[in-house]
Amino acid sequence: MNVLVIGAGGREHALAYKLNQSNLVKQEFVIPGNEAMTPIAEVHTEISESNHQGILDFAKQQNVDWVVIGPEQPLIDGLADILRANGFKVFGPNKQAAQIEGSKLFAKKIMKKYNIPTADYKEVERKKDALTYIENCELPVVVKKDGLAAGKGVIIADTIEAARSAIEIMYGDEEEGTVVFETFLEGEEFSLMTFVNGDLAVPFDCIAQDHKRAFDHDEGPNTGGMGAYCPVPHISDDVLKLTNETIAQPIAKAMLNEGYQFFGVLYIGAILTKDGPKVIEFNARFGDPEAQVLLSRMESDLMQHIIDLDEGKRTEFKWKNESIVGVMLASKGYPDAYEKGHKVSGFDLNENYFVSGLKKQGDTFVTSGGRVILAIGKGDNVQDAQRDAYEKVSQIQSDHLFYRHDIANKALQLK
C-alpha cells in the first residue's frame, strides 16, 4: 500500500523509518518532511503541512491508501476531516476530537465531568482576574495558556512574583484570553501512548519518560522535550495497569460519550503521585521525542497495528529486549530566540539519528529550527543505552548546539 506521512520533525522521521520497515508498505511519501528522510521515503518539501488542498491533490495523484498525521497543528486545523471526506484512511483524530490537545480547558472539563484523576484547576478569561487569583492561591502553581504552544505554554511558578511574570508572558499586551491555573502535583512523570478507536483503547505496554526542561537537573524553561528513554524501570507494571484502568479506558469512553470519535494515538502525559497516577496533559498525537525512542524499541509492525485498530482489533505490541535513550541537540538560545543556518555534520542518515531542524544547503546540513537532531542509544539496560547515546552525540560536529548531559539519569538513580 501507499502511505503518506504528514510532518517535518524528528517524530515524523521516526514514523517514516518505522513504517518503511513494514512489508505492508510499498511506497512511502512524506509532506513536507526534511532532506534527512530521503533514504527511507519520497520527500516533498515543496508542499507545506498547512496546504490542505495541496496534500489532498497529492494523495489523489499518488493513490495513497493511508495518511499518518504526525504534528498537532494539522489535526487541530482539520486536515484529517478533509482527507476522510475524500475517502482516505487517516491515522489521526478529526478536528473535534483533537480539541483534547488544542484546548487545555476542554481537557480539564471532560476529566472533571468523568472523574478522571487530574490536578484541581481554576480557569480565568481576563488578565485582571488572573492577577487577582494568584494573590491567594497555593504555591507553587502551574500556569497554562489555553491552546497550542509547542510544549512551551506551561510555567510552574514558585512565588507570587513568578506567577505575575507568568501571567505577563501568557497575556502579553492582551487583556483577555483563557488561562488555566492548576494545583502543582509532585511525583514521577511518564508518557503513555494509547491507540484509540472510539471506546477501544489499547495502551502501549512500554512507557517513556520525557525531559521537558532545557537544562541539566531539570532547570531552565520548558521545551518541546530535550530527550527521552524507554522503558522506565521505576514505573511498575501495576502503575501502568492502573493508568490504563483509571485514565486510558475512561477517557476513550468519555470522548465517545460526548460525541467525539477519536481515531489515532492519544498521548497521556501522567504523573505518579502518592494518590496514584494523574493526568498532566493529553496530546492527540505521538510525543516528540517519545515517539523516536518508543518506535526504535518497537519490534512489531506499526502499519499492522494501525490496520488492526481501524478494524477494531485489540492489537498486541511487541518490543525488543533492550533499552533506548534519545538525547536532543538544540540550537543555542532555544526555547527562546536562536540563530539558524549553522552547519552540522558528523552524523549518518540512519536509525541512530532522527532529524527535527536541519535543511540541506548545497552538500551540507544547516540548522533550521530550535530542536535540531536526536541521537539514539541502544543497550541491554538504561546505563548501556545512555552511554551509547552520548557516544552518538559526541560524533556530531557543530559549535551552535547544546544538549542535556543527564538524560535517563533518573532511571539509574532510582533503579
Swiss-Prot record:
InterPro entries (UniProt xref): ATP-grasp, ATP_grasp_subdomain_1, PreATP-grasp_dom_sf, PRibGlycinamid_synth_ATP-grasp, PRibGlycinamide_synth, PRibGlycinamide_synth_C-dom, PRibGlycinamide_synth_C_sf, PRibGlycinamide_synth_CS
One of the GO BP terms on file: purine nucleobase biosynthetic process
Entry binding sites for ATP: 134-191
Biological pathway: Purine metabolism; IMP biosynthesis via de novo pathway; N(1)-(5-phospho-D-ribosyl)glycinamide from 5-phospho-alpha-D-ribose 1-diphosphate: step 2/2
Domain of life, source organism: Bacteria
Pfam families in alphabetical order: GARS_A, GARS_C, GARS_N
Entries under PROSITE patterns matching the protein: ATP_GRASP, GARS
Record-linked NCBIfam families: purD (TIGR00877)
Protein name: Phosphoribosylamine--glycine ligase
Source species of the chain: Staphylococcus aureus (strain Mu50 / ATCC 700699)
